[in-house]
Amino acid sequence: CAPENVSGLVYGGIDVVSLANNHILDYMEPAMIQTQNILNEAGIAHSGSGMNSYEAYLPTIKSIKGQVIAFLASSDRTGQYNNYQPYLNAGENKSGFAYMTPYYIRQQINSVGSFADLIIIEMHAGSEYSHAPGSDYDSISRLEDFRNMKTNPASLIGFQMTPDQESEIDDYSWRLDRPKLWDRAIRHFAIDEGADLVVVHHPHIIQGLEVYNGKLIAHSLGNFIFDLNYPETYPSMILNSKADESGFTEF
């Protein structure tokens, strides 16, 4: 995509974008930095990528009509599950995107919870070309453990963590995670932790809208302007909503 195409985003009124996706390092660090700089020059805020994990997890904060809105972005499309290297998630001394796990979602939400009136989480995740969220890893017991933070995804390969709400996880390692995160469960978890709206992209086609505990989850809005030669990818949606101090309404 040519850098000058950012003018289309400006013309379309785009104010905030997520850079947490599996293509952010397609042309390595120089292209990621160029992308960030072009967006900065165009006045478009972004989150979800960085030269290290600290930068990648930083939120975008917007104050709109007296409401402070935090935009959090992350992805689980690291390449670890197929051993596609180099992995795409950022690390302590490695560029990439913010890695999406229950542990890090909780940390992201906690980092803005004290001052943000509304929290939007953008997730680049899910099954491509699937019309409904979910995966082969869903099970009733696993979903319940997931919601209670009793089981880390890494426990699927023998690594277990059982943190309480306030404790530090000394033996936690992202290297042991796998992105089998039970699509609906991790989105429910984000709402339970304090998110007001969850928007998901990556499947390339429209998936369902779900209201969970009074909060909306858009499981996939389609491609918007990402053209593919598959008829099922042609439809797309724009999500409209009003917001006040109580949250997002009138979807």
Label every PLM stretch briefly.
Residues 1-251:
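Acidic, metal/ion-coordinating pockets
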